[in-house]
Structure formats: structure tokens, C-alpha cells
Design a protein with these regions (language model features):
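Transmembrane alpha-helical segments of polytopic membrane transport and secretion proteins
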Residues: 1-16, 83-90, 282-363, 438, ...
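Alpha-helical transmembrane segments and their immediate interhelical/interface regions
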Residues: 52-80, 177-198, 278-308, 343
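Glycine-rich helix-loop "coupling/hinge" segments at transmembrane-helix boundaries
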Residues: 230-259, 388-389, 546-574, 607-609
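Short, membrane-interfacial amphipathic segments enriched in basic
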Residues: 40-46, 387-396
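Membrane-water interface segments at the C-terminal ends of transmembrane alpha-helices
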Residues: 8-38, 48-178, 211-232, 236-238, ...
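Short hydrophobic faces within alpha-helices
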Residues: 96, 185-196, 264, 409, ...
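Helix-loop-helix hairpin linking two adjacent transmembrane segments in secondary transporters
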Residues: 257-269
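Short helix-to-coil transition segments within interhelical loops
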Residues: 180-212, 500, 506-527
Length: 625
């Protein structure tokens, strides 16, 4: 057997073992969840329950509204900031935003907008002088009677979910836009669109955004699934009479009555059916809407004989027809810019975002800064009567209580480190060993935790832990957190791996270096920023896990998330804020370390190094030797 055939067989064997190691628990969990929802009597009881219809409607309304607002906010921020210094600054702030878990963000936002929160107190402080001066007679000594949190319309829940998902979609978009092949194609097509008379903003919306939206289908569906099925955030910010169907299913699954338990499984599967229907509708819209989008892009083609450009030149309709044909056939992707060509006046780096829109990135950053400040200040608040702007006393009692809960802190930290490390190792091994055809075929299975409702996924993990005898111990929790973090880690690594220049491996092979020497000396060092970022993403996902920790841990293990959500139902505001701040500080620290590890470095040339003006091949030759 030749060495190349032996290497290929080894890679296939390793990929098969990796697929089996992941597929077995995933499929087992799915099968357990399927069996839990086969009780016909539970479906009848679910249909007859008076809260089912209203809870389902609330789930649909809040989930769809939050997802639509998050997508619209992402699109506007990209249109107004991509290719400008604002985009670079926004990218630098994304790790801190992503590090803030959903539950911690919800708690911080509630501390801001609650009837006795910071914003109301600030408003009272501003209105009080006017009230005394004008003699308005406003009663400002008690919190207002309106509901800004857990309101019956779900507005607080929508605000939390929309604001929290925008950074995730921006991060997913940045991963696509930073791929050399995607950036090159969009730059060329935007230039061509502007030569045909479209403004920079119009070219972005007609050319770049439709293509980017198609590449963001998986992240958008993940946002939709999460918004429709979230439990911990709905418990904190959502209405309670009735709650969302996800919360109702969780409450029934917590019940000791087997009939109620079966109703909870049926409700979880009802959510799964709704999610599947919406995902199918999105796929159909993407498939059948492409032709309509292209036709709308070149609307007026039959009527207009010429299109006037800014310079006053004319472009014939035959050029527009050629452009439409090239776009539909993907011919523009095969165009290559001339070597050494300077960016044109119409390149996205200079004309996409001029003038308006700068407030969007600033408002998003300000919102996250205010939430973080509310968490930190809220954790040291003592006596704080309304309407005082500042508390009468500051205290560290909440942080002393956190320090006394050392097992909770160490469990949170240990689980996050172990599960994110395992997820990164598996994802790297899979991307290195699995053939592209295998990756495409198993993509649906790998992303299963992203598309299943969180209640249903936690139910399957619990049944898996019971069957394998790992219920209520740290091994079961590690497996559950790893399976939850893995899809996000894989999603963050696929873009950098897919955009890696494969020609570098050919150059290394021509210099007599093995594939593993190339991977160890060239590929992984070049991808260290992506690897560090994916580890940080997995860490943050593990810290944020609520339902898997409750179900698989059987209540024996507490984490910062479970403690913060549990304290939200009580009156210990400072202790709740302290655990929520801990939820944020741990991932923020890891994201900071990841940014430091992935930073660009400059090393002094060693003996025999290539000269600065050497070609890329000569530099690679000196690197691998």
C-alpha cells in the first residue's frame, strides 16, 4: 500500500471514529426525546389545555419579532459601518458582547428598565427640578405602576433577545466577510454595480446583502430556534400569565405527575414542529426567492433603454442583461482583480458607509456598557430607597456570598474549560480528517443541538444520562456541556478552515514536508486566532447552559447561571447581580485571553530567514525548513 493511500485510509478511519463518538450520544438523545413524545393521551391533553393556544401564540410572536429585529439590526449595522473604521471598532467590541450570557444580559437589562431601576431613577432625577419649578404636582416618591419587565405583551423579552442576538449575527457575518474568496467576489460585484449607476448604499443592499444573507441562513435559523424555545430568559423577562410554551413545557416536565410530564414532552415536540415548519419556509423562500431578487435588482430592464451613471455616461440595457446573466450563473466569482490594482472609488472599503448610521454601533455598544455597569454596580448596592439615584450604602456582602459558594464557581469554571477544550479538539480533528462529502452529509446531525428546542434537547440528554448511568455526576454534565458547545465551536471554525489557502500545503509538500508538519508548523499557527476564538465561544456557551445543568445534574451541581436564575425569583437583588456579573466576567476573561493569544506578532528574523522582499513561496520555504 502506498503512503498516500495509507494516509487517506487513516484519515477516513479517524473521521469515522469521530463521527461515531459524536453521533452515538446525539442520536441516542434524539431517540429518547422521540420516545418521550409518543404518548397520544398527552397530545389530547395538550390540545385541551386552556393555556396551550395563548402560550404558543406568545412563543411565536416574541420569537419571530426578536429574530426579525435582530436580523434587521444586523443588516443596518453592516450597511452603515462595513468597510469603515466604525466596523473595525465594532469588531473589537464583539468579543465582550458575546461573552455576556443571555441570562446575565437579561438580568442587567431588567436592573436598568425595571420600575425601580436605574433609568427610572435617572428620569426622576431629571424631572424633579421641573416638577418643583412648574408646580406640576407629579408623585415621584414611588415607582411607576407600569410593567416594564415581565409585561403581558412580551416586549421586555423581545428587547432582551433582539439586543443579545445582534452581536452573534454580526460575528457570523464577519466570519463570512473575512474569507478571502467572499471578500474578493463581493468587492468585484460592488464595483461592477456602481459602474452601472447604482449608489454605494444601493449596491450594498442589492448585491452584497442578498448573498451574505444566504450565507447567514444557518446562524439566522439558530437565532430563530433559540428565540422560540428559550426558557431561562423567558423566566426572567417574559410574561408569566400565561408564560411562553417553552416555559410551560419546562414546568410540566418538572412536575412529578407522569401525565403532566408527558404533556411537557408533547409541548416540546409541538415547538419542534413549529421550528421545523419555519425552517422549511425559510429554505423555500431562499430557493424560490432568488430569481425574484435578481429580477428586482435589474427591474426596469424591459423599459429602460439606458441607465445614466454619475459621470454622465450611458450603460446599455445589454450590459444590464449581461450582468444579470453573470450574477445568476456565478460568473462574477471567477473574475480576478488585476495584480497591484488600487481600490476603486466604488470599493466597499470607501463608499459603503458614508454619513448616516454611525449612531447604530454606538447605541449597541452603549446598551451593553450600561448593562455591564448595572450588573457591577448592582452587585455592591446596599440600602437603596426610591427615588434616590445612588444607594445610601455600598457593600461587598454579595461578593462575599459568591466567594463562600466556591463549589459553584469551580464547577462553572471546570465544566466550561473541559467542555470547550473537548469541543475544539473534536472540531479540529473533524475538519482535518473528514472528507468534504462527509462533512456535508453529517452537517445536519452536527447542528442538531442548534435546531432542537432547548427543552426537548435537555429532555433527551437527561434520558441519555439515565440510560448510561451518568445522571447526577460530573461526567454526565461534562458530556452534556460538550455536546451543547460543539455546534457553536464548529460553526466558528468552519469559516476560517474553509477560507484557508490550500496552495500553502502544496508548497510545503513540494519542499518535502509531511502534511502533519505543515499543519503543526504553518496551518495551526496561522489559524491560532480562530482556534482561540472558538475556544472562547465554547467556554461562553458552557457557562450559559441552564436546562442541561438542571436536568443532567439532577440538582446536585450549581453553576453561576442556575444560581442567578434561581435568585431572580427572590428579593436578593445584589446577590442576583453578583452571580450574573460572574456569568459575564468569566467568559470576558477567556475572550480577552483568546484575543491576546490570537494577536498579530512580529518576530525577529532568525538565522537563515528569508529576506523581507522574498516571495511568498520563498518565505514559506524558509519557514518549513
Amino acid at each position: 500500500m502506498s503512503p498516500s493511500v495509507s494516509t487517506l485510509a487513516s484519515k477516513h478511519l479517524a473521521a469515522a471514529l469521530l463521527a461515531a463518538a459524536l453521533g452515538l450520544p446525539l442520536l441516542w438523545s434524539l431517540a429518547a426525546a422521540v420516545l418521550a413524545g409518543l404518548d397520544a393521551a398527552a397530545w389530547v391533553a395538550l390540545a385541551a389545555h386552556p393555556q396551550t393556544a395563548s402560550a404558543l401564540w406568545l412563543n411565536l410572536y416574541t420569537g419571530l419579532a426578536a429574530s426579525a429585529l435582530a436580523l434587521a439590526g444586523t443588516a443596518l449595522l453592516l450597511a452603515h459601518s462595513f468597510g469603515t473604521p466604525r466596523w473595525t471598532r465594532l469588531l473589537g467590541r464583539l468579543p465582550a458582547m458575546l461573552a455576556l450570557p443571555h441570562a446575565a444580559f437579561a438580568i442587567g437589562l431588567l436592573l436598568l428598565i425595571a420600575p425601580s431601576g436605574w433609568l427610572v431613577r435617572l428620569g426622576v432625577a431629571l424631572v424633579t427640578p421641573l416638577n418643583a419649578w412648574l408646580g406640576l404636582g407629579l408623585a415621584l416618591d414611588a415607582p411607576p405602576a407600569w410593567q416594564s419587565t415581565q409585561d403581558p405583551w412580551g416586549l421586555g423579552l423581545i428587547a432582551v433577545l433582539a439586543l443579545k442576538e445582534i452581536p452573534f449575527l454580526l460575528w457570523a457575518a464577519a466570519a463570512q466577510l473575512q474569507r478571502p474568496d467572499v471578500a474578493r467576489r463581493l468587492t468585484l460585484e460592488l464595483r461592477l454595480a456602481q459602474t452601472l449607476g447604482y449608489s454605494a448604499r444601493s449596491a450594498w443592499w442589492r448585491v452584497a446583502w442578498p448573498q451574505l444573507l444566504a450565507r447567514l441562513l444557518a446562524p439566522v435559523l439558530a437565532v430563530l430556534v433559540y428565540s422560540l424555545t428559550v426558557v431561562d430568559v423567558a423566566l426572567l423577562a417574559g410574561p408569566s400569565t400565561p408564560p411562553t410554551l417553552a416555559v410551560l413545557a419546562w414546568q410540566w416536565l418538572q412536575d412529578a405527575d407522569p401525565e403532566r410530564n408527558a404533556m411537557g414532552a408533547a409541548a416540546a415536540w409541538l415547538l419542534a414542529a413549529v421550528v421545523a415548519a419555519l425552517a422549511l419556509a425559510a429554505l423555500l423562500a431562499q430557493h424560490y426567492g432568488r430569481g425574484w431578487a435578481v429580477a428586482r435588482w435589474t427591474r426596469g430592464l424591459a423599459r429602460a433603454r439606458t441607465v445614466e451613471t454619475r459621470a454622465g455616461t450611458a450603460v446599455s440595457t445589454s450590459s444590464l442583461a449581461s450582468m444579470k446573466t453573470a450574477t445568476e450563473g456565478g460568473a462574477l466569482a471567477r473574475v480576478r482583480p488585476e495584480a497591484g490594482a488600487a481600490p476603486s472609488r466604488g470599493s466597499p472599503s470607501k463608499t459603503i458607509a458614508k454619513g448616516s448610521g454611525s449612531w447604530g454601533a454606538g447605541a449597541l455598544s452603549l446598551a451593553y456598557a450600561a448593562v455591564a455597569a448595572a450588573l457591577v454596580l448592582g452587585s455592591v448596592i446596599g440600602v437603596w430607597p426610591f427615588p434616590d439615584m445612588w444607594p445610601q450604602a455600598w457593600t461587598w456582602q454579595a461578593w462575599h456570598a459568591v466567594a463562600d459558594s466556591a463549589p459553584v464557581v469551580w464547577t462553572t469554571l471546570g465544566l466550561a474549560l473541559a467542555s470547550s477544550a473537548a469541543a475544539v479538539l473534536w472540531a479540529v480533528a473533524w475538519l482535518e480528517c473528514a472528507p468534504p462529502a462527509w462533512q456535508r452529509r453529517l452537517q445536519g446531525l452536527l447542528y442538531l443541538p442548534l435546531v432542537l428546542p432547548s427543552v426537548l434537547w435537555a429532555l433527551g440528554l437527561h434520558r441519555l444520562a439515565l440510560a448510561w448511568g451518568i445522571d447526577g455526576n460530573i461526567k454526565g454534565l461534562w458530556l452534556a456541556h460538550t455536546l451543547c458547545a460543539l455546534p457553536y465551536v464548529l460553526l466558528s471554525l468552519q469559516g476560517p478552515y474553509g477560507g484557508f489557502d490550500a496552495r500553502l500545503q502544496a508548497v510545503a509538500a513540494s519542499l518535502g514536508r509531511t502534511r502533519w508538519a505543515f499543519v503543526w508548523r504553518i496551518k495551526w499557527p496561522l489559524l491560532r486566532a480562530a482556534l482561540a476564538a472558538s475556544f472562547a465561544v465554547g467556554f461562553a456557551v458552557s457557562v450559559a447552559q441552564y436546562l442541561p445543568t438542571l436536568y443532567v445534574g439532577a440538582g446536585r451541581f450549581g453553576t453561576a447561571t442556575t444560581e442567578a436564575v434561581a435568585l431572580a425569583a427572590g428579593g436578593q437583588r445584589s446577590l442576583m447581580a453578583a452571580f450574573a456579573a460572574l456569568q459575564w466576567l468569566l467568559p470576558a476573561l477567556v475572550f480577552g485571553l483568546a484575543a491576546w493569544a490570537g494577536r498579530a506578532r512580529r518576530f525577529a528574523p532568525h538565522a537563515g530567514a528569508a529576506p523581507p522582499d522574498a516571495t511568498a513561496g520563498e518565505k514559506l520555504s524558509h519557514t518549513v525548513q
